[in-house]
Amino acid sequence: MPDKAGRKMQVAIVGSGNISTDLLYKLLRSEWLEPRWMIGIDPQSEGLARARTLGLETSHEGVDWLLARDELPDMVFEATSAYVHRDAAPRYAEAGIRAIDLTPAAVGPGVIPPANLREHLDAPNVNLVTCGGQATIPMVHAVSRVVGVPYAEIVASVSSASAGPGTRANIDEFTKTTSKGVETIGGARRGKAIIILNPADPPMIMRDTIFCAIPEDADQDAITASIKEVVAQVQTYVPGYRLLNEPQFDPPSVNSGGQALVTTFVEVEGAGDYLPPYAGNLDIMTAAATKVGEEIAAKLAGASLSASSGGRS
């Protein structure tokens, strides 16, 4: 739907790689957002070529070209690298352009839609944390809103084939940013994140394991219900997100530091818009980015999309 003036938000995609191209296909379906520009640095980029055939203005001259236009976007989606976004973010802010950051730069607040999106709809720059964070932090949030979680650990296993040079170059930032998100967004007092690049061929879809320490007398039924509710919320924008089985509860043991545990297993199958379905780790980022952009546009138009955009009470 358009804004109060009857106009969709005009958006630019900065970056022309696989993630940006997949994001483009999602944005083209949006009732709230209209992709107008795609910016890259490689004139031979397949992403730029596809964008041109779909009617977008494109350039391989980077952010300088975009910001020199007579008409500027209302919003940019940046899928480059952390250091590139850190340089560009102040320029977007100076130009009055909202930014949705798909890199680990974390210039703005981290956003996981079911957990805290409503808190940050007015922020000029929001960060999508990481693919592992988008897949696992909702589950930590689901537990922590029922009981205290002194410690949470997530293990994200993704196909090696889906991990491009950007992902590999950002492994350290992935673990730091995801661990911080487990704490500040997920609600765990202490968090840890591990990523595994699975070399299996044919490629395996993204699978994640989420361990949460909980009190021994925690209400297991309430925790299970909360987990399933949040899974359903994620599925509104990532249909391929699902529980592999029921949450597993274990009593305190030496191995768990004397604490009870709930373990959740999820998998993420991509929609196959541009990326293959096994690349759920990338698809969940582009889907979450689209969700965040649409919610921002809806708020500016005085509307509300759904109840799946979390906010802590």
Swiss-Prot record:
Keywords from the named record: Aromatic hydrocarbons catabolism, NAD, Oxidoreductase
UniProt-annotated catalytic positions: 131 (acyl-thioester intermediate)
Enzyme class: oxidoreductase
Keyword Coiled coil listed: no
A Pfam family it matches: AcetDehyd-dimer
EC number: 1.2.1.10
Entry-linked NCBIfam families: ac_ald_DH_ac, PRK08300.1
HAMAP family: Ac_ald_DH_ac
Positions of disulphide bridges: none
Protein name: Acetaldehyde dehydrogenase 1
Family as reported in the entry's similarity comment: Belongs to the acetaldehyde dehydrogenase family.
Molecular function via GO: acetaldehyde dehydrogenase (acetylating) activity; NAD binding
Catalytic activity: acetaldehyde + NAD(+) + CoA = acetyl-CoA + NADH + H(+)
BP GO annotations: catabolic process
Residues reported to bind NAD(+): 16-19, 162-170, 281
Species whose genome carries this gene: Mycobacterium sp. (strain JLS)
InterPro entries in the record: Acetaldehyde_dehydrogenase (IPR003361), Acetylaldehyde_DH_C (IPR015426), NAD(P)-bd_dom_sf (IPR036291), Semialdehyde_DH_NAD-bd (IPR000534)
